[in-house]
């Protein structure tokens, strides 16, 4: 029994040592790659802000109003509710 425990510990130590090998500092992306030459700072033309996530996603379990109120309280408002268009409306 002690032999099996010793072998198991030795195997675990060997696995830890094998996984702790240093990672090479060589960049695997070649210089002529398409993404390397693209401009890194491209302007975003239009943002898409989805305000219906809390009301739409949780409406199946009837938690939509609770989640909306919690979301509004976390933002610093007094509470909130989901209107008929499934948009969270926060109260002042």
Swiss-Prot record:
Changing residue 38 to D: In strain: 2CPA7 and 2CPA14. Changing residue 15 to T: In strain: 2CPA12, 2CPA43, 2CPA46, 2CPA51, 2CPA103 and 2CPA105. InterPro entries: Defensin_invertebrate/fungal (IPR001542), Scorpion_toxin-like_sf (IPR036574). Residues 1-20 form the signal peptide. Hemolymph (at protein level). CDD domains: DEFL_defensin-like. The keyword Secreted applies. The keyword Glycosyltransferase does not apply. Residues 21-52 form a propeptide. It is found in: Secreted. Its main location: secreted. Induction: By bacterial infection (at protein level). Keywords: Antibiotic, Antimicrobial, Cleavage on pair of basic residues, Defensin, Disulfide bond, Immunity, Innate immunity, Secreted, Signal. Belongs to the invertebrate defensin family. Type 1 subfamily. This is Defensin. It comes from Drosophila melanogaster. The lineage of its organism: Eukaryota, Metazoa, Ecdysozoa, Arthropoda, Hexapoda.
């Amino acid at each position: 029994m002690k032999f099996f425990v010793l072998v198991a510990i030795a195997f675990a130590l060997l696995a830890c040592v094998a996984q702790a090998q240093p990672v090479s500092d060589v960049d695997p992306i070649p210089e002529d790659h398409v993404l390397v030459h693209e401009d890194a700072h491209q302007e975003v033309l239009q943002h898409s802000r989805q305000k219906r996530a809390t009301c739409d996603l949780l409406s199946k379990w009837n938690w939509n109003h609770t989640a909306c109120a919690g979301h509004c309280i976390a933002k610093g408002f007094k509470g909130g509710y989901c209107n008929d268009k499934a948009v969270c409306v926060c109260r002042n």
